[in-house]
Amino acid sequence: MKNNNFNFIFLHVKILAGGIMFKNTLDNKRYYTLNYFFKMKFGQKVFKVPIDINSTCPNQVNGGCIYCSNKSTASISDGNLDILEQFENGKKIMEQKWPDSLYIPYFQSGTNTYNDKNLVKNYVDKLLLLPKVVGIDIATRPDCLTEEWLDYLDELNKKTFLIVELGLQSSNNNTLNFINRGHNNEVFKDAVKKLHERNIFVVAHIINGLPYETKEDMLNTIKFVNDCGIDGIKIHMLYVAKNTPLASIYEKDKFHILTKEEYIDIVCDQLRLLNQDIVIMRITGDPTLDELIAPDWLIKKFVVLNDIDKEMVKRNIYQGDLL
């Protein structure tokens, strides 16, 4: 069941001289942007501020996911700092350009529902007392949602706007096994169902370009998350990070890594298959320079974003136009 405890805004379409596209007066994209969603929900600019509470991951005992470097991509948070200090540091950066913006603390690093619930609750309570904080975002794994945690998330969702982000990466169970993900796609589907029973906004993380996956596999992942009824999605491009099992595999095998052109083509086709009411919260990866082995084109994030926009205009396509 889709959540109904917030004012969900559907994108509208309009006819233009060049064809059909989304009516999005903020940034004129052809897909449902997070910026637009936040603007419609809260009436002004909203930023997510990364928070690191040193959460670990239960899958680490089994070696962890093969691509994991135990770093958050492009995170401005520092797990050695007090959470209020982390939040203020992130907020100051945004305030320089957008002084009137609102904020959602984002528990980004690690598996946060694998942490002590009372510790997390204490952090959340402190953050919700701060001015301009309008919600909480918690990242976790679909296999780390106990009934105790679900009860707490249900309670939290009744207090504020809550986002729960779940890593899926691929709907192909053979791929999930190869990357040592530690769960199958049914676990993800069940987690989404349990969160939606509590009217919680659910975001899926997927990765394009996982070793030996075909374009069909990546499109099937989109069809799978559509069927799960997710509310938002983050689409990442696989990158090889230093000091990871994936780096060792890449050094020996040199498996194919998507070119920028291949990635853009796949993302455009994925967006066409994605329900129009799903918010696109991320559409490319954002690795740090010091850990990146390949692909080097991923460093230029805004070039990739602009090229996706250009390709959608060129092909006269938009999110969900094949549904």
Where are these regions (language model features)?
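N-terminal [4Fe-4S]-dependent radical SAM core
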Residues: 20-104
